[in-house]
């Protein structure tokens, strides 16, 4: 059941029908857990709760919603079709909004072998490998396509709630802020590429980056 405030802000209506049950079930929903219960998880239970797999399916939008910070992780690999951001997602049932980014912002990375294009409200953004696109709250129609179906783009995305709007921005790997860390001796020499970061652009609350390990290095952060 969902509550929705009417435009005049005087009446609150309750809706519990006309929901796309298939679309709701297609989005994986993860719940938070307390530390006492987590101590008793088996390896399989830990993987089921904490690990995201199967993000990329041809011409599909795969989404995982977490009740921790209300974050949504998405994966899209368009091959033969142009894929909408809300494909397979009942936005009204899951978020109580009329379109995906009505009250959300999103960061988009292309981690695929080929280049791709993201179209937001009619404006196209071309993403090569390791490029990033920030879309602010309020973009109504967002679609994804690959330049070459033989070498499709793979869009990795994270969306967070947003209460204010800024500007959409394409950030290339060259434009990202660089932060070198680690050393060869400890096998963790790496560069933190800060794409969606206050030093690069303004966002509501989302930050995203990409870590690049140097040859011979094999870990990022040592588990505590």
Language model features by range: what are they?
Residues 109-112, 116-126, 143:
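Long, mid-chain structured domain cores
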Residues 115, 132-133, 137-145:
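Histidine-centered metal-chelating micro-motifs
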Residues 144-203, 208-210:
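Surface-exposed beta-loop interaction hotspot
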Residues 55-94, 187-224:
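A short glycine-rich, His/Asp/Glu-containing loop-to-beta-strand
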Residues 101-116, 210-215, 224:
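Short, conserved beta-strand element in jelly-roll/cupin
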Residues 121-137:
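Short acidic-glycine-tyrosine-enriched beta hairpin
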Residues 6, 11-71:
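Non-cleavable N-terminal signal-anchor transmembrane helices
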């Amino acid at each position: 059941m969902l509550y929705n405030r009417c435009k005049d802000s005087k009446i609150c209506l309750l809706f519990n029908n006309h929901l796309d049950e298939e679309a709701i079930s297609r989005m994986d929903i993860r719940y938070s857990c307390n530390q006492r219960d987590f101590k008793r998880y088996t390896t399989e239970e830990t993987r089921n709760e904490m690990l995201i797999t199967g993000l990329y399916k041809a011409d599909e939008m795969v989404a995982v919603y977490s009740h921790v910070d209300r974050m949504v992780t998405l994966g899209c690999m368009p091959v033969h079709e142009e894929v909408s951001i809300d494909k397979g997602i009942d936005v009204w049932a899951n978020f109580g909004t009329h379109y995906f980014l009505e009250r959300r912002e999103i960061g988009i990375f292309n981690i695929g072998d080929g280049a791709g294009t993201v179209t937001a409200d009619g404006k196209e953004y071309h993403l090569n490998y390791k490029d990033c696109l920030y879309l602010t709250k309020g973009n109504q129609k967002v679609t994804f396509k690959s330049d070459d179906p033989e070498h499709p783009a793979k869009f990795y995305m994270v969306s967070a709630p947003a209460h204010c709007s800024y500007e959409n921005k394409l950030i290339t790997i060259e434009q990202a802020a660089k932060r070198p860390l680690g050393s060869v001796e400890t096998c963790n020499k790496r560069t933190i590429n800060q794409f969606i970061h206050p030093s690069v652009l303004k966002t509501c609350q989302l930050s995203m980056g990409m870590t690049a390990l140097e040859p011979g290095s094999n870990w990022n952060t040592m588990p505590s």
